[in-house]
Amino acid sequence: MQMGESPARLRDGDFIKKLYHARSWAPARYLKYDPIDLAKRSMAPIQRAHTKIVGTTQADNLRSLAAKIWMIEQAQHTVDLVYYIYRHDLAGNAILGALCNAVQRGVDIRIMVDSLGSWSMNHEELKAFETCADNAGYIRDASGRATPFRARIQVVIVNALTSLSSWSNRRSHDKLIIVDGSFPGRDIVMTGGRNISIDYYGIKADGTLNRDSYIDLEILLRSENSTTANELTVGDVSSIYYTLLFLHKGNKRIHPSPYADDEQYGPNTYPQILGRQQRDLAFVKNLPAMKTVFASMPGYFANDFRSSQVRIAHELGNLTAKDTVTNVRETKSRNLNSIGA
């Protein structure tokens, strides 16, 4: 799918084929453009959207985790996530468990984590998670019909410390999840300050309430029903942004180890890791405090949104600029979508 191309211009079969290829990882040497440069030069539009703030209270902390899992469980076509910090604790495992179930029903998944904020020697948990796609279902079109395209899990490390095209002090602090971003009326975007770590979500590892969680907030965005057929939605623009970050030349695509199953016993074999993720998902959903929150999610996503005008701002230029600190004003001015431009 060409950047800026509206889904309404394409028949379902053509659209899914183009979408599948547009969502595919490709090494930088195969690209005809620099994704970060394109992101800086392309002005993001001001758009109409339904918005809701996920606030800073204890109840909001619980609601934020439930919302992420609920969004994934409601996804019909695609899910994209990127987080600076992704901890493989109760919250992180529960989300991966939900994503594993999603790909097996035919939802195409991309996930990015920052190489420093989510530092790991080998990212075994994410590699194990990718094997969920061994039993992936087939992506469905907007009418719900199965297509010939099998759902995937693509895991990318942002500005990998082992990449020759990366800089150790150039980080992605994105916290973003996009569900069905290219499907108007179904798209949901969540962004803000919460990372994927139990410290943000109001519960402790044993499931008891944690009233000392980090204080942060997020915003939910959905496209308006009044969006015209040829108008890009907030889901479209968020997905385009995600793709440009996904294809950044400093990133590294990781894959499961071909010899991972040679170790039959131990806590870190792929089946053991996947089992933990599913158990943690079930544990979170059955916590007394969380069961009530999960039960409220259909109404939460249906009501009390505000009609707003929004624009997706970003600082992707900082991933490649060599004078970010010494020449802040000029660096921001080169990015048409910078908050400080």
Language-model features: locations:
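HKD-type phospholipase D/PLD-like phosphodiesterase module
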Residues: 5-9, 13-15, 19-78, 85-341
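Non-Sec secretion/translocation targeting segments of pathogen effectors
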Residues: 1-3
